[in-house]
C-alpha cells in the first residue's frame, strides 16, 4: 500500500505565503495599522473553529473528483490530475487532513507573528515620523523667524546706506562752499576761459538744485543764498570775457576782410568760421550760467551779451550788405531789385540764425529786431522804387514774387528757422498793395471812367482764327503758373473787345490773389460798375451817329464778354452802400418856415438817418444785358412788321419782301457774336415775334367783315391764303 503523502506534490507554503505576505506592509498605510491587526486576529479565530468542527465529522470514503466539476477547477485542489492516471489515485485517510490543518495553523501563526512584527515596526516608524514632523515644523518656524530677521536687517542696512549716501552727498554739497568762495572772489587770470570755470559752474548748479529740493535741512537757506551769490559773481566774471572775445574775433575778421574783394566776402566762410569756433566754447558755459538763474538775473545778465553780439555782427555785415543792395538799386528795376535782394538776404538770414543759435540762447524777438535793423537799407530802397513805380504789371509781379517767397519759407522743411521770419516782409507787402491799389484806382479813373469812344470801337476788325479769351484757359487760378502780361490784352484786341472791357479784365487778372479778397471784391465791383456805365455811354454815342441796331449789338457783345469772363474770378457781387437820409430834415425845415408850431417837430426830426442799401453788381449787369437784347429784338421785329397795316392786303407783299432780307440780319449779328448758339437764340426770338405779329395781323384781316376773298379776286387784288401757308413761308425764309 502506497503512502498517501507521496501522491501530493511537495508544496512550499511558507514560500508562497511569504511571497504573498511581503507586500502587505507596502499596501497598508500608517493610519490603518490597527485595523489590519484586528482583521488578522478575527481570521485566525475563525480558522481554529473550522478545524475543531472538522475533526468531529465522520469519515467519508475517498472518491475521485469529477474532472468536469467547476468547483474543483476553481479551487485547483488537484493540479496534477491532468498528468496522472486516475487508477493510481487511492483514497486519502482522515488523519492527513488534520496534519495539513495543523500545518496551516502553524503557517498562519507564523504569518501572524510576522504581521505583528511589521505592525510594531510600523508603529515605531509612525512615531518617528510624527516626531520628525514636529521637529520640521519647529525648524520651519525658526527659519521663517530668521528670514524675517534677515529682511529687517536688510531694510535697516539699506536705510543706513541711504543715510550714509545722503551724508556723503550732503558733505559734497556743503563742503565745496569754502573752496568755491575763494576761487570766485579771487579768480586767476583768464579764469572764465578755462575748463575749470565751467566745472565750477556745473558744481554750483548741482549744489543749488540739491538745496532747493531739500529746504528742510537746518542750514539750507544759508548755503543756498551763498551759492546764488557765487553764481552772480561767476556771471560778472564771465561777462567781460565774453565781450572781449567777441570784439577780438570781430577785429580779426575785419582785418582779414580788407584783404578780400567785397564781392566775395559774403560767399566765403570768413564771417562765420571763427565765430562758430568761438561759439563752440562759449555756448556751453552760457547755458550752464542761465540754467538756474532767476528771471531778474537773466534780464540783467543776457541783454549785455545780446547787445555786444548784435553790434559786432552789424559792424561786420551792414557795409557789405549795403554795398550789394546799392548795386541792385542802381538798376532802377523794382522786380530785379526785389528778386536779387531777397535771394541775398535769405542766405544771410539762414547763416545768421544758425550762428546766433551756436553762441547764445535763442531769443526770437531780439534776433528779429537785429535783422530788421540790418535790412534797413533794403526797406528804404524798396519804398523808393515802389513810390516811383507806375507800371501795374511790375507791381503785380513784385507782389506775386514776395508772396511766393513767403510761402516757400512757410512750407519749407527747415526746422531750425522760425516760420515767423516771413513777418519781416509784411510791411513791404502792405506798401506794395497800397501802391498797387493806387495805380489801379488811377487806371480806373483814367482808362475806364474817362475813356472817350471812337468810331473804330464800334466796328473793330476781329481775327476769325483767334481763340476766345478765357481766363481759366490761361490758368490764372494756378499760383505756380506765370503768365505773359501782354497775352490777355493781345487776345482781347484780336476779339475786337471794347477797350474799356479789355482794360477792366486785364486789371482784374493782374491783381487777382495779390490783395485781400475783400479788397479785390471792392475793386472788382467798382470796375464792373464803371465798365457798365462806360458801355452805356458808348452805346448812346454810337446811337447818335450810327445804326441803333449796330450800337445795340456792340453793347450786347461786350456785356456777354464781361459776364462770361467775370465767372473766372471768385467775386462777391453784393455790397452794402451806406448813406445819410436828409429828406425828413428838409421837410421839417420847410414846415418850420411855414408854421411856427413846426419848431418842436424840427427838434425831433433834425437828426438825419443812417441808411444802408444792398447793391448787386451782377444783377445790374444782367438787367442792362436784358434791356439791350430786348431792344434789339423789338427793333428788328418792328423793322419787318411795321409795313403790315390793318385792312390792307397789299402790305403782305411788302412784308414778304422785307423778310426776304432776313439773311442780312444773320450776317449783321454774326459780325458781333461769334458763338452759333447765341446767334440762333437771337434769330429764333425774332422769328417767333415776327410770326406772332403776322398772326395778329391776319386775325384782324379775317375779323374785318367788309373784306372777302371773292371781292378781292374780282378787283384783281392779292387773294388771302390760309394762315398756315403764310407761317410756313415765313419760317422757310427766316430759317
From Swiss-Prot:
One of its GO terms (cellular component) is cell division site. It is a peripheral membrane protein. It comes from the Eukaryota. GO terms for biological process: Golgi organization; intra-Golgi vesicle-mediated transport; intracellular protein transport. Signal peptide: none annotated. It is found in: Golgi apparatus membrane. InterPro entries: COG3_C, COG3_N, COG_su3. Pfam families: COG3_C, COG3_N. Keywords: Golgi apparatus, Membrane, Protein transport, Transport. Component of the conserved oligomeric Golgi (COG or Sec34/Sec35) complex which consists of eight different proteins cog1-cog8. Acts as a component of the peripheral membrane COG complex that is involved in intra-Golgi protein trafficking. COG is located at the cis- Golgi, and regulates tethering of retrograde intra-Golgi vesicles and possibly a number of other membrane trafficking events. Belongs to the COG3 family. This is Conserved oligomeric Golgi complex subunit 3. It comes from Schizosaccharomyces pombe (strain 972 / ATCC 24843) (Fission yeast).
